[in-house]
Amino acid sequence: MGVDLRQVVAGILTITMFVMLGQMLHRDYFDAVQEKVQGDAHDIEFHGSKVAVEDGLVRAFEAGTKGPWMEDSHELKPCWSISQSDEAVSSKGYVTFSLTNGPEYHVSQITDAVMVAKHLGATLVLPDIRGSKPGDEMKFEDIYDVDKLIKTLESVVKVVRKLPSHVSLRDIAIVKVPTRVAEDYIKEHIDPIFKSKGNIRVTTYFPSVNLRKSSQGAETDPVSCLAMFGSLELQPAVNELVESMIQRLKTHSKKSGGRFIAIDLRVEILEKKNCHETGAVGSKTCYNAQEIALFLRKLGFDSDTTIYLTQPRWESSLNILKDIFPKTYTKEAIMPSDKKTKYLELENSEYENVIDFYISSRSDVFVPAIPGLFYANTVGKRIALGKPQVLVPAEISGTSGLPANYISPYISKKNHLAYSCFC
């Protein structure tokens, strides 16, 4: 029996179409889904989505001369401006709060506290920093620059270093606010409590980890932009440490022009999630070391690529990644010896979380192997810094893939909240 060549070609095209459609469905889950937080932030699920690639991103990859690396774009400038109506007013009382759960949460917590204090006409009290374990507390100045915070916010809200002695903690009402709290919510739900008690303590909860910008036509509050992207900077000693670690990574990356990849991959979280399938074609909630290694190799990153992992300490399950990419390091391998006693003495300390967050924000490529606010807020900082190469993991059928196809939808679709604040 003869074979009709046209039927064969049509069959091949049909199969190819279904493969491409499956990949697109997989990636469309990445940040289109509103993920709910239940208790521990690490329970948040994460979905991949293959996105339509913009011409500019494709050209950026094609223009590069060193494989899959994407050139940085220019740093964006703040679009927000503080009007007279936004300026600080005389204080009526105090707003207190704490920074908890790591720097990816600090960004949202400081923003919500500033918004509440601003729209209540209250004075903001400098927060403390609390770790995941009871009694694990630090001063704000242990990690962040106090003077920078006060100076940045002085035009919109007054900040004091501590609560006056005449204010009793028993007289402070505890108020829970949803992240990205808006002025209307503050007026309706918080202002009556503030007027009744005179002082409040704000705790932020996260009904969603979505950081997509508001719907078209809706304006982002300039005070929110200022607080989220302008208020938190590392204090000099911590910043110097982060810079030294980045320079060590660049030194290991001479063959790739000093460029390196940061991967948010923590074994404890991967084991908790079990990397189960979600039901979308090929989609997963997280990716382990072997899957990430294959993903990067198929995108064209060679074995000489330097990789930084957020994993606190090396574990045997990471060996496969180091077998494929020998220049793979955790923080203990690149931190100066004289700094380890202070910054690595406590496992999962706030110092370690901060180091991970700021190195991931500054790396040439960022790969989120696990979901959550770490991914979303790291992308926000990278957008402001002009570092758009955030590659969302996926199982690539075949032997290779185009890096531009795996750029985070936050960037390829320009729907991250940061695009409302920078231009």
Swiss-Prot record:
BP GO annotations: cell wall pectin biosynthetic process; fucose metabolic process; mannan metabolic process; mannosylation
Binding positions for substrate per the UniProt entry: D264, L265, R266
UniProt pathway: Glycan biosynthesis
Organism annotation: Arabidopsis thaliana
Keyword Transferase found: yes
Protein name per UniProt: Protein MANNAN SYNTHESIS-RELATED 2
Alphabetical UniProt keywords: Carbohydrate metabolism, Cell wall biogenesis/degradation, Fucose metabolism, Glycosyltransferase, Golgi apparatus, Membrane, Signal-anchor, Transferase, Transmembrane, Transmembrane helix
Membrane-crossing segments per the record: 7-26
Gene Ontology, cellular component aspect: endosome; Golgi apparatus; Golgi medial cisterna; Golgi membrane; plant-type cell wall; trans-Golgi network
Family stated for the protein in its record: Belongs to the glycosyltransferase GT106 family.
EC number: 2.4.1.-
Enzyme class name: transferase
One of the Pfam families matching this protein, by short name: O-FucT
A GO molecular-function annotation: mannan synthase activity
Domain of life: Eukaryota
CDD domains: O-FucT_plant (cd11299)
Membrane topology field: Single-pass type II membrane protein
Tissue: Widely expressed.
Purpose of the protein: Glycosyltransferase involved in mannan biosynthesis.
Topology, Cytoplasmic side: 1-6
Parts of the chain on the Lumenal side: 27-423
InterPro entries assigned: FucosylTrfase_pln, GDP-Fuc_O-FucTrfase
Subcellular localization: Golgi apparatus membrane
